[in-house]
UniProtKB/Swiss-Prot annotation:
HAMAP family referenced in this protein's UniProt entry, alphabetically: PurQ
Residues forming the catalytic site: C86, H194, E196
Protein name: Phosphoribosylformylglycinamidine synthase subunit PurQ
GO molecular function: ATP binding; glutaminase activity; phosphoribosylformylglycinamidine synthase activity
EC number: 6.3.5.3, 3.5.1.2
Keywords on record: ATP-binding, Cytoplasm, Glutamine amidotransferase, Hydrolase, Ligase, Nucleotide-binding, Purine biosynthesis
Function text: Part of the phosphoribosylformylglycinamidine synthase complex involved in the purines biosynthetic pathway. Catalyzes the ATP-dependent conversion of formylglycinamide ribonucleotide (FGAR) and glutamine to yield formylglycinamidine ribonucleotide (FGAM) and glutamate. The FGAM synthase complex is composed of three subunits. PurQ produces an ammonia molecule by converting glutamine to glutamate. PurL transfers the ammonia molecule to FGAR to form FGAM in an ATP-dependent manner.
Subunit details: Part of the FGAM synthase complex composed of 1 PurL, 1 PurQ and 2 PurS subunits.
The reaction(s) this protein catalyses: N(2)-formyl-N(1)-(5-phospho-beta-D-ribosyl)glycinamide + L-glutamine + ATP + H2O = 2-formamido-N(1)-(5-O-phospho-beta-D-ribosyl)acetamidine + L-glutamate + ADP + phosphate + H(+); L-glutamine + H2O = L-glutamate + NH4(+)
GO biological-process terms attached to the record: 'de novo' IMP biosynthetic process
Organism for this UniProt entry: Bacillus mycoides (strain KBAB4) (Bacillus weihenstephanensis)
Location, primary (coarse class): cytoplasm
Record-annotated Glutamine amidotransferase type-1 domain positions: 3-225
PROSITE patterns per UniProt: GATASE_TYPE_1 (PS51273)
Length: 227
């Protein structure tokens, strides 16, 4: 399986993503600059955290216009797994690939610590290796991680089982304690916590590795077992 880590000016978690895929998952991965127009050779696309374009205007508001995002849109339409973490989640929302918005944290402060997440839906291609309602420890590092959507959108997310992760103790004011959501098709996941920073016990825990293992399992079952 071949992964692409999209690198924007200001990305700073691309190295963590690369490490998670190459060193922990053992799969092929490339850094891909944001001006790349074709991502057809990749099986999965990863949008890392950071401060793309300095977070000017809004977080992710400029990155959505990058050439690579047109290719990401195409990959999403093809059903390829797309994972956006932190700033990557913000870019997915700004691009319209996921509903809602990410606002300033309720306390107006940047937060960097480990939090507990509850796995709300373990039937997605990103969460199949977890147990439903499993509680995992994953780091956060954001100032604008307060997820917001209107009541109609929240109802739709709940009815369609699109809420992948919730905070056990809400750190930022996100509506309905939402930490991560998938699109209706189930192949695009956006989450504020950083699973790529929790893939090795030496780094404090490996409970985020199952996100990437789930992606790999889905791909193998689809393209290897059925080949």
């Amino acid at each position: 399986m071949k992964f692409a880590v999209i690198v924007f000016p200001g990305s700073n978690c691309d190295v963590d993503m690369f490490h998670a895929i190459k060193d922990e998952l053992g799969e092929e991965v490339d850094y891909v600059w944001h001006d790349r127009e074709n991502l057809d050779e990749y099986d999965a696309i990863l949008l890392p955290g950071g401060f793309s374009y300095g977070d000017y205007l809004r977080c992710g508001a400029i990155s959505r216009f990058a050439n690579a995002m047109k290719a990401v849109q195409k990959a999403a339409e093809q059903g390829k797994p797309i994972l956006g973490v932190c700033n990557g989640f913000q870019i997915l929302v700004e691009s319209g690939l996921l509903p809602g918005a990410l606002m300033r944290n309720e306390n107006l402060k940047f937060m960097c610590r480990t939090v507990q997440l509850r796995v709300e839906n373990n039937e997605t291609m990103f969460t199949s290796q977890y147990e439903k309602n499993e509680v995992i420890n994953i780091p956060i590092a954001h100032g604008e991680g307060n997820y917001y959507c209107d009541e109609a959108t929240l109802k739709q997310l709940e009815e369609n089982n699109q809420i992948a992760f919730r905070y056990v103790e809400n750190p930022n004011g996100s509506v309905s304690d939402i930490a991560g959501i998938v699109n209706e098709k189930g192949n695009v996941l956006g989450m504020m916590p950083h699973p790529e920073r929790a893939v090795d016990e030496l780094l404090g825990g490996a409970e985020g590795l199952k996100v990437f293992q789930s992606i790999l399992k889905q791909w193998r079952e689809t393209y290897v077992v059925n080949a």
